[in-house]
């Protein structure tokens, strides 16, 4: 305890610093999709194409949001683990990219009327 009562024999300096800088929002990417199933391949494809055209009509005019259609797949559905084709399934994805999280979030909410969310990140 002797050191507590002795005066300091050196100068003591406290330093602190801070900096602040506004940075741009991170890039937000969302992928949505439509998937349809039915007996006739042409009918399934038409429903997928109609849903994607609707989504693109809404998404393309959105300021600051880049849109891109992704893979389009059509494949058979088999009955009860057999080799007999019982129908068809088709799927197409839509990629949205931008820095305005609020605008992308609102667009996703609207698009969920006909598309499902695959990922947001």
Residues of each region from the PLM?
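Short, charged, surface-exposed interaction patches
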Residues: 2-121
């Amino acid at each position: 305890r002797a050191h507590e009562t002795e005066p300091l024999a050196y100068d003591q300096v406290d330093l602190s610093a801070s900096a602040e800088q506004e940075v741009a929002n991170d890039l937000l990417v969302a992928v949505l999709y439509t998937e349809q199933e039915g007996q006739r391949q042409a009918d399934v494809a038409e429903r997928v194409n109609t849903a994607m055209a609707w989504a693109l009509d809404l998404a393309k005019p959105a300021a600051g949001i880049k849109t891109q259609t992704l893979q389009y797949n059509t494949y058979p559905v088999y009955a009860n683990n057999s080799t007999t084709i019982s129908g068809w399934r088709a799927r197409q994805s839509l990629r949205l990219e931008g820095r305005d999280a609020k605008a992308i979030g609102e667009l996703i909410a609207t698009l969920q009327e006909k598309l499902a969310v695959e990922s947001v990140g």
